[in-house]
Amino acid sequence: MASPDVEYRCFVGGLAWATDDRALETAFSQYGEVLDSKIINDRETGRSRGFGFVTFKDEKSMKDAIEGMNGQDLDGRSITVNEAQSRGSGGGGGGRGGGGGYRSGGGGGYGGGGGGYGGGGREGGYSGGGGGYSSRGGGGGGYGGGGRRDGGEGGGYGGSGGGGGW
């Protein structure tokens, strides 16, 4: 009963900003028929977020691609290829996918941002400041930007904090 819903999809991370959907499809098509290839772009800037997905027609092609492409060079960047986690979560999974914004900072923004998360939970300004301190790879800026939920000005601090990666 679940077989029509099964997708043989790979998550591809560490992509160069210059890599587009077509380049992704070309790189992976050697492993089997590619049904879809999609680079995820930032909603505000339109620039690549450095990851995407490739959907294959069958499981063997997907597994061969993971085996063959993980750790390989694509457009000058060493990429990470894993099986995409897509089961059982439309809305919930989307929320966690968006949460990948603070994970993509290397985890430092999320872990170090604990000060901003706990201490600045009510005050957007403090949350944004915490994001700035914890942003070793600029990831803290994304998390600080999340402070906008608490106050519109917190987002502003988060944005500038992200630029000053430590």
Curated annotation (Swiss-Prot):
Q: Where is the RRM domain?
A: 8-86
Concerning PROSITE patterns, the annotation shows: RRM
Can you tell which superkingdom this protein's organism belongs to? Answer: Eukaryota
Q: Name one GO cellular component term.
A: nucleus
Q: Name one GO biological process term.
A: RNA metabolic process
GO MF annotation terms:
RNA binding
Has UniProt tagged this entry with the keyword Nucleus? Answer: yes
Q: Name one Pfam family in it.
A: RRM_1
Q: Entry's InterPro entries?
A: Nucleotide-bd_a/b_plait_sf (IPR012677), RBD_domain_sf (IPR035979), RRM2_NsCP33-like (IPR048289), RRM_dom (IPR000504), SLIRP/GR-RBP-like (IPR052462)
> Where are the stretches annotated Disordered?
68-166
Q: Which UniProt keywords apply?
A: Nucleus, RNA-binding
- Tissues in which the UniProt entry reports expression: Predominantly expressed in meristematic and growing tissue.
Keyword Nucleus among record annotations: yes
- Give the compositionally biased regions (Gly residues): 88-146, 153-166
Compartment annotation: Nucleus
The protein's role, per its UniProt record = May play a general role in circadian phenomena associated with meristematic tissue.
Protein's name according to its UniProt entry: Glycine-rich RNA-binding protein GRP1A
Origin species: Sinapis alba
